[in-house]
């Protein structure tokens, strides 16, 4: 009996030591020194082999050299949509049905920070899979507003740092290298010093930081198009006349909302002249993508400067861009983010939504 008790005690002790060792081993496995290197996107999940879109002179072209125009929409930050239970394949199917060939993902620094990159990559992965299945392209936009060199921003949701911005593009370009579905990287949404309230914008510094970002991206992936915005909330490209960003394969972004141009007499020609002088001229030498545009009436939901218009803006801006092969992406396919394209999640079009849906349908 005594021998049996001793044997049992030894067995229990051995079992407990084994459990402790396993637990300790598991704990070690979770240590920072055992975190694996980042992985790349699994392209076996994609069903369509899409053409890479490239820069050729002042045009975007497909692999056959045919001119390609992006025509599409902005959605809200994917994290917002997921929180509202609106992040789904059916959303992308609706965008395709409207006629979009590109979807812009405005990734806010605050949502990136809240989720962490591993969790947010899962969201982007879903967008890539869904867009690819519908033969649509994606623009990834680091959606901050302010002046990055001075790290001063318009709202806490846009707060970031140079280090975080460089790390974001390093990680994104590594993960999605060679994935044709992600065609464009919009390096910084809307640079502005807010009239001195966010530092003092200097084109040399802005040009330099964009060139450095492009170098990081190109070290991982040269098949993507870096997109650079000018000052005044991505409206003013005049500095590139004398000092263009010194990197190949790039395009320029513009957000030509209706109240940005202020002619004394509001004729179509006067608007055209102002647009041409501030940003339209760039299309003679580089691809230009209007990654935000749209309008809302003065009494409409979320009406604010610079997006208020009586509707005359729509036909005029479309004519201007079409004459110059400028790609366009409307803001925003969301019932809350103004100017809105839809009134609700039944996808009922607003005034501008109806207009731009017709424009998209012409190219389906």
Residue ranges, per PLM feature:
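Extracellular glycoside hydrolase catalytic/binding regions
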Residues: 52, 84, 156, 166-184, ...
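Bacterial N-terminal signal peptides
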Residues: 8-18
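Positively charged n-region of N-terminal signal peptides that target proteins for export
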Residues: 1-4
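Feature marks short, surface-exposed loop/turn motifs that line or immediately flank catalytic pockets
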Residues: 77-79, 109-113, 146-148, 191, ...
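N-terminal carbohydrate-binding accessory modules
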Residues: 21-102, 358-360
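An active-site-proximal structural segment forming one wall of the substrate-binding cleft
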Residues: 83-102, 106-107, 113-144, 150-187, ...
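Acidic/histidine-rich helix-loop elements
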Residues: 64, 68-89, 112-116, 153-157, ...
């Amino acid at each position: 009996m005594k021998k049996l008790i001793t044997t049992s005690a030894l067995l229990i002790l051995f079992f407990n030591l084994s459990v402790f060792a396993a637990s300790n081993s598991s704990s070690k496995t979770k240590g920072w020194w055992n975190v694996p290197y980042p992985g790349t996107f699994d392209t076996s999940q994609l069903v369509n082999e899409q053409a890479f879109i490239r820069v050729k002179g002042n045009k975007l072209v497909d692999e056959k050299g045919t001119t390609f125009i992006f025509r599409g929409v902005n959605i809200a930050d994917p994290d917002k949509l997921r929180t509202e239970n609106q992040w789904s394949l059916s959303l992308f199917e609706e965008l395709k049905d409207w006629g979009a060939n590109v979807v812009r993902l405005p990734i806010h620094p605050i949502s990136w920070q809240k989720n962490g990159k591993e969790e947010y990559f899962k969201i982007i992965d879903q967008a890539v899979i869904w867009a690819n299945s519908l033969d649509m392209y994606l623009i990834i936009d680091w959606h901050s507003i302010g002046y990055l060199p001075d790290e001063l921003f318009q709202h806490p949701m846009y707060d970031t740092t140079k280090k975080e911005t460089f790390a974001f593009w390093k990680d994104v370009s590594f993960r999605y290298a060679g994935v044709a579905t992600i065609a464009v990287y919009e390096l910084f949404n809307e640079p502005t010093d807010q009239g001195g309230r966010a530092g003092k914008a200097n084109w040399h510094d802005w040009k330099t930081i964009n060139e450095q970002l492009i170098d990081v991206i190109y070290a991982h992936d040269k098949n993507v198009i870096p997109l650079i915005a000018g000052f005044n909330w991505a409206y003013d490209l005049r500095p590139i006349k004398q000092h263009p960003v010194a990197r190949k394969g790039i395009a320029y972004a513009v957000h030509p909302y209706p109240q940005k141009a202020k002619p004394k007499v509001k004729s179509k020609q006067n608007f055209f002249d102002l647009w041409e002088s501030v940003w339209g001229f760039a299309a003679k030498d580089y691809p230009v993508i209007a990654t935000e545009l749209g309008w809302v009436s003065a009494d409409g939901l979320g009406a604010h400067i610079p997006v208020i218009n009586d509707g005359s803006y729509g036909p005029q801006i479309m004519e201007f861009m079409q004459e110059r092969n400028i790609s366009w992406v409307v803001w925003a396919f969301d019932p809350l983010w103004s100017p809105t394209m839809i009134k609700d999640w039944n996808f009922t079009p607003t005034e501008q939504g109806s207009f731009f849906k017709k424009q998209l349908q012409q190219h389906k």
